[in-house]
Every structure is written in C-alpha cells, then in structure tokens.
C-alpha cells in the first residue's frame, strides 16, 4: 500500500461539538491549545478566534463572547507546511534529496518527519493537533507562564534553592489586589500584588525572601 505524499500538501479539518455553560458576569472563558503542527485557524461557532503558527507554540483564545449555552461547535483548520520537503531515503546509491532539513525553513518543528538518512519520510509530516485542548474559565485574574528554577550548590545536594516566577494579569477594567499563593511540600507562601485595570505584572518568589523555598533533602530525579 503506497501512502501518498499529498497528505502534507492539503488542508485538514477537525470538528468537535461540545456543551458548555456561558461565563457569568465578571468571568472569562479561554480556549487553550497546547500544541498544533504547523499552522492553524481556530473557529468557534463560525467565528474565527485567531491563528497559530509553530509546532511548539501554545495558543490561548478568548472565547467569552462566543460561547453559547448548550451545543458549541469548535473547528480547527490545519494548513500544510510551506516547505514540506520531498521524501527521499538518502543512501550512497540514491544520493541526496530535499529531505533532512527543508522543514527547518518554516521554523522549529518535527524536522525529521520529512525523512532523513536514518528514517523514511512521514507522509503527512506529523501535521495536526498533537497536544491537549482545554476550555478554561477565569474569574477576572489570570496566571501565565509559571517557571520553576532549582539551584543546587553542586556537588552538595542536601539543599535546593527554588525560585518561582509567574505573570499575573488583571482582566478587569477596575484595579485589583491579588493574593498569589505558592504551596511547596505543604508549606504556603503568599505575595500581595496591586494591579491597575488590564495590567500584567511579574511576581517572583525567591529563597532570599521566603526561606520555605530552601528545600532540605530534595528528592533528586
């Protein structure tokens, strides 16, 4: 059975019907895509919420005004990569072909899926939805891109110093005072943050300020 290479040169459509409540006043709804390869258009109830480009980019789309009470229809259009390459199993006898790097021209993606000297080409180039999709509700405040950094004074591994960063966003048109709580091994630390309307701030928890973040006898990987 020959699998055609045209699979990576055409659009693909995903369609899902789901039931959801409509956000109440002061709340928001977000459609979150953890990973799509390589380009996509996102449609909810016949409204285009936006686009995504890049296999390792997350997409978050405000669905607050587009959800209906009851059945909703989510449609995702996957567009083919601009430079899909040509599958060609390289060997001393077959010579070199346009594989093993052509997908890099588009940006970070699964570059070996076009074929290499150690793998045959994947005919659809692994395009499609490859990570989870969520519908998330917020209550006027949203956290973004939380990062945890661990420092060990190697070769000593008896204490780990942990630094946590996160972005806090006020989605409301009024000022907000927000408590950001961090729970580590059952111990909680808190920072109070004042946010102007629609403001976004970086909050950092460091072991210099919060001694709880000096973790003794850490469980090493």
What do these predicted regions represent?
Residues 1-221:
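Secreted/periplasmic carbohydrate-active enzymes, especially glycoside hydrolases
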């Amino acid at each position: 059975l020959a699998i055609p290479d045209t699979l990576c040169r055409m659009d693909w459509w995903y369609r899902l019907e789901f039931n959801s409540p409509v956000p109440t006043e002061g709340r928001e709804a977000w459609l979150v895509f953890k990973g799509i390869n390589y380009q996509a258009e996102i449609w909810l109830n016949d409204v285009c919420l936006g686009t995504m480009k890049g296999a390792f980019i997350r997409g978050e789309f405000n669905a607050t005004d587009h959800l209906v009470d009851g059945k909703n229809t989510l449609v995702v259009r996957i567009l083919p990569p601009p430079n899909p390459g040509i599958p060609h199993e390289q060997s001393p006898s077959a010579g070199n072909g346009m594989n093993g790097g052509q997908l890099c021209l588009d940006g970070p993606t699964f570059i070996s899926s076009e074929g290499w000297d150690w793998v045959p080409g994947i005919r659809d180039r692994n395009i499609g939805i490859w990570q989870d999709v969520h519908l998330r509700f917020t209550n006027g405040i949203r956290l973004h891109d939380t990062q945890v950094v661990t420092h060990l004074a190697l070769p000593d591994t008896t204490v780990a110093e942990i630094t946590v960063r996160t972005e806090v966003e006020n989605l409301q048109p009024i000022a907000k005072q927000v408590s950001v709580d961090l729970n580590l091994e059952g111990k909680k630390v808190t920072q109070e943050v004042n946010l102007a309307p629609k403001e976004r701030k970086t909050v950092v928890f460091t072991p210099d300020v919060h001694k709880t973040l000096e973790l003794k006898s850490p469980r090493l990987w």
